[in-house]
């Protein structure tokens, strides 16, 4: 009988196909109408499946066909296009005037000068017209002080959250552009060793600097820092803008032998970052921990935090004033930050936005008279020249970028970072998807983005009569308060940033060397 059926199928292929399709849809119909998990499928068998398919591809449909250039979040199409064009070395100019609503509340206007700084006089350091060194030395009293070559740098993103090719590309981009590369709390990996300056971030899990019980081990940290002269600073992560006050977990399926070895954790088990540090529980202990690491490694040590309660910052400023100890730099992460997967409420409602958070912390340290001795770093959607200028005018010495750097190496804002199914291969450990990121090519694009960013910052500074963007003040920015109402940034925020000593750009291109 089987032979007869096969012969019939062979002689009647079209009829067999239709019968096969009919039986397939009958099976799907029976399954849909009998299952209880999905209401729509149960009530509308077969047809109801279209809803879930359209829901699945909805973000892509909206991104490419539905949304206009200014609608999407967190980065709209115009912003992404600027990053992509800059990273590829293409024309990143826009024609036919602005599409922005310049009277919209909060809109910044940068005030140019009638007599700009002559670009013909601009100093070019070692053939790099985009060189913008930090005007301050970080940790001048430490054994190995550090002056960043670039005021635009790559923020904390861990290997584990990002794939190895993405980390390689970012590190090569940082190397070629002179930026530093923050490891993220996942610790220092060999993918960070492509030649860029490194900021080693230490989070609540103390990954890569812990013993077998999970406790922080200074000797392990000292040994690794001693062997790797590329490590220039240590950053203690208190919190991040995406999910402040909440820990994290790298699922067991992602914890392969390589990640386990880098983080000093067990392979095949969930890798947990607690929501609080075990090495300190108050401000005094935090300052002592900072000094312990700084004295042990000789490196500048700072902290990264989103801003919530202000009492912590007041106590920290007072402790630093009394003891002349504490962080050499402070990274303020705005609530706009978003490289970490987070519960929706945390992403939307926990921690203050950058401008408000930075203003509250900075003014506290000004009142205590110690703001000038700290290097201030801003992060949280600051990867565009206009936003960077505002942050600098508020008091930032450096800018850290994360998602914008991801976009420069191919991220398409699919917002699937938390699923391990990043279609661009950036935020995934899937070996097949990762192959889409070529470290050599994407590294060059990351470098071009950072260099293009800095060139535009320099151009804006020159237009406003300055040689270096660090000279911007709150008087150079006006903020729209509605129709026909503008106020200076300085007047709006209620403070004047510290004046940073500046002579000429060339004087700040001497960089202290650290040898292993």
Question: Which functions belong to the PLM regions below?
Answer:
Residues 210-233, 237, 353, 363, ...:
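Phosphate/diphosphate-binding loops
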Residues 2-175, 179-196, 200-212, 216-242, ...:
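Conserved, well-structured core domains of diverse proteins
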Residues 184-186, 299-304, 327, 371, ...:
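Flexible, glycine/charged-enriched surface loops at secondary-structure junctions
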Residues 272-434:
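Glycine-rich phosphate/ribose-binding loops and adjacent secondary-structure elements
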Residues 200, 206-208, 252-281, 340-355, ...:
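Glycine-rich tight-turn/loop motif centered on a GG-T
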């Amino acid at each position: 009988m089987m032979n007869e059926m096969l012969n019939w199928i062979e002689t009647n292929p079209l009829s067999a196909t239709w019968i096969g399709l009919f039986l397939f849809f009958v099976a799907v119909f029976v399954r849909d109408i009998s299952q209880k998990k999905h209401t729509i499928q149960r009530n509308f068998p077969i047809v109801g499946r279209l809803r879930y398919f359209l829901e699945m591809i909805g973000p892509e449909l909206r991104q490419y066909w539905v949304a206009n250039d200014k609608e999407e979040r967190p980065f709209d199409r115009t912003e992404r296009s600027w990053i992509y064009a800059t990273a590829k070395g293409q024309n990143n100019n826009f024609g036919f005037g602005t599409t922005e609503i310049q009277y919209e509340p909060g809109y910044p206007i940068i005030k140019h000068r009638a007599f700009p700084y002559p670009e013909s006089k601009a100093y070019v350091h070692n053939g790099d017209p985009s060189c913008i060194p930090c005007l301050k030395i970080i940790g001048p009293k430490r054994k190995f002080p550090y002056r960043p070559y670039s005021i635009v740098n790559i923020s904390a993103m861990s290997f584990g959250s990002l794939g190895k090719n993405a980390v390689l590309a970012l590190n090569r981009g940082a190397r070629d552009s002179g930026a530093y590369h923050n490891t993220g709390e996942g610790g220092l990996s060999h993918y960070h060793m492509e030649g860029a300056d490194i900021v080693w971030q230490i989070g609540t899990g103390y990954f890569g600097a812990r013993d077998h019980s999970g406790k922080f081990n200074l000797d392990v940290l000292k040994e690794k820092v001693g062997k790797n002269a590329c490590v220039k600073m240590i950053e203690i992560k208190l919190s991040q803008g995406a999910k402040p006050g909440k820990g994290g977990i790298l699922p067991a399926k992602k914890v392969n032998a390589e990640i386990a070895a880098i983080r000093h954790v067990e392979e095949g088990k969930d890798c947990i970052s607690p929501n609080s540090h075990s090495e300190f529980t108050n401000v005094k202990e935090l300052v002592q921990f900072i000094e312990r690491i700084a004295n042990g490694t000789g490196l500048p040590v700072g902290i990264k935090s989103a801003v919530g309660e202000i009492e912590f910052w007041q106590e920290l400023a007072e402790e630093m004033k009394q003891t002349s100890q504490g962080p050499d730099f402070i990274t303020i992460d705005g609530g706009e930050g978003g490289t970490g997967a987070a519960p929706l409420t945390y992403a939307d409602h926990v921690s203050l936005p950058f401008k408000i958070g930075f203003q509250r912390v900075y003014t506290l340290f000004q009142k205590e008279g110690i703001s000038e001795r700290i290097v201030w770093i801003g992060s949280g959607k600051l990867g565009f020249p206009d936003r960077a200028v505002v942050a600098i005018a508020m008091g930032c010495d450096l800018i850290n970028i994360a998602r914008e750097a991801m976009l420069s190496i191919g991220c398409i804002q699919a917002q699937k970072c938390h699923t391990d199914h990043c279609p661009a291969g950036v935020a995934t450990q899937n070996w097949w998807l990762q192959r889409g990121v070529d470290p050599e090519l994407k590294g060059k694009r990351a470098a071009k983005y950072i260099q293009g960013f800095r060139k535009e910052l320099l151009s804006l500074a020159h237009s406003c009569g300055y040689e270096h963007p660090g000279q911007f003040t709150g008087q150079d920015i006006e903020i729209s308060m509605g129709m026909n109402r503008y106020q200076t940034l300085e007047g709006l925020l209620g403070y004047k940033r510290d004046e940073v000593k500046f002579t000429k750009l060339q004087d700040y291109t001497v960089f202290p060397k650290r040898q292993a």
